[in-house]
Amino acid sequence: MAKSSMKAREAKRAKLVAKYAEKRLALKAIISNPTTSDEDRWDAVLKLQGLPRDSSAARQRNRCSQTGRPHGFLRKFGLSRIKLREATMRGEVPGLRKASW
């Protein structure tokens, strides 16, 4: 089970990503636009670098909603493989059951 501080850190990152998403998108559009002048592009790059590091979506880590486990995460369910198996065995996941052939 992940430390509660790790879960809190990920929640904080998610808030920052949501807060700065529009600003980051606008700056990236200015930077990637070929008609933008070099001065405007450089200003946009500096502003983008000035944003908080954790406001980048690439720094987020998918974690299990129950345990906070970062590995073996299944995006469709929001759970780690271990917790998904336990929930499946209890019959809590509709349409999912143990394979037998």
Curated annotation (Swiss-Prot):
Single GO molecular function: structural constituent of ribosome
Keyword Disulfide bond: no
GO biological process: translation
Annotated keywords: Ribonucleoprotein, Ribosomal protein, RNA-binding, rRNA-binding
A Pfam family the protein falls into: Ribosomal_S14
InterPro entries: Ribosomal_uS14, Ribosomal_uS14_bac/plastid, Ribosomal_uS14_CS
GO CC terms: cytoplasm; small ribosomal subunit
Similarity field: Belongs to the universal ribosomal protein uS14 family.
Summary of the function given for this chain in its UniProt record: Binds 16S rRNA, required for the assembly of 30S particles and may also be responsible for determining the conformation of the 16S rRNA at the A site.
HAMAP family linked to this entry: Ribosomal_uS14_1
Subunit structure: Part of the 30S ribosomal subunit. Contacts proteins S3 and S10.
Protein name: Small ribosomal subunit protein uS14
Organism this protein belongs to: Shewanella loihica (strain ATCC BAA-1088 / PV-4)
